[in-house]
Amino acid sequence: GHHPGIFMQCGPVRHRVDARTQAAVRPFEHRVLVRPTAFQRLKPPEADKRLQFQALYRALIDDDARTHRICEDVVSCVREGRSPLVLTERNEHLDRLAQALEAHVRHVVVLRAGMARKERERASAHLAAIPRDEVRVVIVTGKHVGEGFDDPRLDTLFLTLPVSWRGTIAQYAGRLHRLSDGKQEVRIYDYVDLDAPMLARMFDRRCRGYEAIGYTVLLPASAIPGWPVDVILPADPVWKRDY
């Protein structure tokens, strides 16, 4: 960060970039659509937080109803003419999403971390060759997004597994911010698993991350006042105060 050597080499700070200010001058709206899920933990949480997190990820990946709902939303967006980026943190989850979507979308392009160079080049060439008037879905792992992935057509992000660090949120959302003809709104679908306290707290942190980069967070109409009976409201007071 602020090591003296940086200032010695580069001089004093002349300008600071604010993410909210940048969002305000872009020629499109920035919105997050919250999608509460009916995910329920079947086992008591692990005492070790790291093991608990891994167990929750495993359960989320295995939740077929949750995956089906995500794919329904993706297909709906494609039919609107949107260009979605479906993002997951696990290769197994990526494969399940791809298999489900290939039955409904002609072009499903899969990019994952650890791909061989030639395999990655073939997938990138396939993506580049798809005409603008043909629908497509890009499915990636978070690690691949961090490897310089860039596609100006993207206007919708599906966050299919929970993350919380603000820098990760900014990096993922940034894939939507390239200017492209006809882009009027960028949209993030956030799948919220509120029955698990750890995941509810992660949602809290994501909301603060979205705000910090200029996004408006939109709750589903069912949350006010009739929250679905199979989804428990989080106990976190920050969530209740904000929403």
Kindly give the residue locations of the regions a language model identified:
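Post-DEXD/H (motif II) to motif III coupling segment of the RecA-like Helicase ATP-binding lobe
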Residues: 1-33, 210
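Conserved nucleotide-binding/hydrolysis micro-motifs of P-loop NTPases
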Residues: 14, 21-25, 37-41, 91-93, ...
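Conserved catalytic network of the ASCE P-loop NTPase/AAA+ motor domain
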Residues: 24-28, 76-79, 102, 128-133, ...
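Conserved interdomain hinge at the start of the Helicase C-terminal
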Residues: 45-89, 93-100
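Non-catalytic, charged low-complexity extensions flanking SF2 helicase motor domains
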Residues: 56, 60, 187-243
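Conserved helicase ATPase core of P-loop NTP-dependent helicases/translocases
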Residues: 85, 95-96, 105-146, 168
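A short beta-strand element within the Helicase C-terminal
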Residues: 138-140, 147-162, 171, 187-190
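Conserved SF2 helicase motif VI
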Residues: 156, 164-188, 204-207
